[in-house]
Amino acid sequence: NSGNPCCDPVTCKPRRGEHCVSGPCCRNCKFLNAGTICKYARGDDMNDYCTGISSDCPRNPYKD
């Protein structure tokens, strides 16, 4: 996607010096800090948090 400032238009991977292209834990081409909520709890659920090393939002390990 050449319209994405984080994306190398040839490889569609993060540009040099950038961490990520997109994802719930990616903002302005960088990973969000560990502990940033990426999915708010619903009902009996628990919040999910960014790890600081990935653009993905991992499932809370304490969920049933």
From Swiss-Prot:
Q: List the disulfide bonds.
A: C6-C29, C20-C26, C25-C50, C38-C57
Q: Write one Gene Ontology MF term.
A: toxin activity
Keyword Acetylation in record: no
| Annotated SUPFAM superfamilies | Blood coagulation inhibitor (disintegrin)
Asked if the keyword Disulfide bond belongs to this entry, the reply reads yes
Q: Which domain of life is it from?
A: Eukaryota
PROSITE patterns, per this entry?
A: DISINTEGRIN_1, DISINTEGRIN_2
- Gene Ontology cellular-component terms listed: extracellular region
Keywords for the protein's UniProt record, in alphabetical order = Cell adhesion impairing toxin, Disulfide bond, Hemostasis impairing toxin, Platelet aggregation inhibiting toxin, Secreted, Toxin
Residues of the signal peptide:
none
InterPro entries, A to Z: Disintegrin_CS, Disintegrin_dom, Disintegrin_dom_sf
Further information: Negative results: does not inhibit alpha-1/beta-1 (ITGA1/ITGB1), alpha-2/beta-1 (ITGA2/ITGB1) and alpha-6/beta-1 (ITGA6/ITGB1).
What does the annotation say about its assembly with partners?
Heterodimer with VB7B; disulfide-linked.
User: What's its job?
Assistant: Poor inhibitor of platelet aggregation. The disintegrin inhibits the adhesion of cells expressing the RGD-dependent integrin alpha-5/beta-1 (ITGA5/ITGB1) to immobilized fibronectin. Inhibition on alpha-2b/beta-3 (ITGA2B/ITGB3) is low.
The record's similarity note reads: Belongs to the disintegrin family. Dimeric disintegrin subfamily.
Q: What is the protein name given in its UniProt record?
A: Disintegrin VB7A
Query: Lineage in the entry?
Result: Eukaryota, Metazoa, Chordata, Craniata, Vertebrata
